[in-house]
Amino acid sequence: MNFIFTMKKIIIFLLTVLGLNTACSQNFENIEVKEFAELINDSNVVILDVRKADEYAEGHIKGAILIDQFQNDFVEQAKAKLPKDKTIAIYCRSGRRSANAAGKLADIGYKCVNLKGGILAWKEAKMPVLSE
């Protein structure tokens, strides 16, 4: 009797852990500046900047499309502007907004990668930015 009770507890624990692991797993990849820089040279990659327009104007990665992640219609704008057959390389200021955006887009079928550290890491690595 005690053995069965213990086994039930173990099974419930394992199922809980497996369920949490699945719920918390990312459906996109976080990559470092060097790998991001190599990736964005591929013609099958679209660069997405999810910062605000004023941040974008201060400096952005060449070729980046701007869609503010804080806009209520972010997902709708992304669907209209981003091809589903290409990898979406996403960045923001520090990597937090872009991770959020990557999760949203990956949930609707996009293949996404997120720049760890965002444009701050990009600039720190002395990578080029364009200003408007």
Q: Model features per residue range: what roles?
A:
Residues 91:
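Short, surface-exposed ligand- or partner-binding patches at beta-edge/loop junctions that are enriched
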Residues 2-10, 24-39, 45, 54-87, ...:
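Rhodanese-like catalytic fold shared by cysteine-dependent sulfurtransferases
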Residues 17, 52-54:
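Intrinsically disordered, low-complexity boundary segments flanking structured domains
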Residues 47-49:
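Structural scaffold elements adjacent to functional motifs in cytosolic proteins
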Residues 10-19:
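Sec-dependent N-terminal signal peptides
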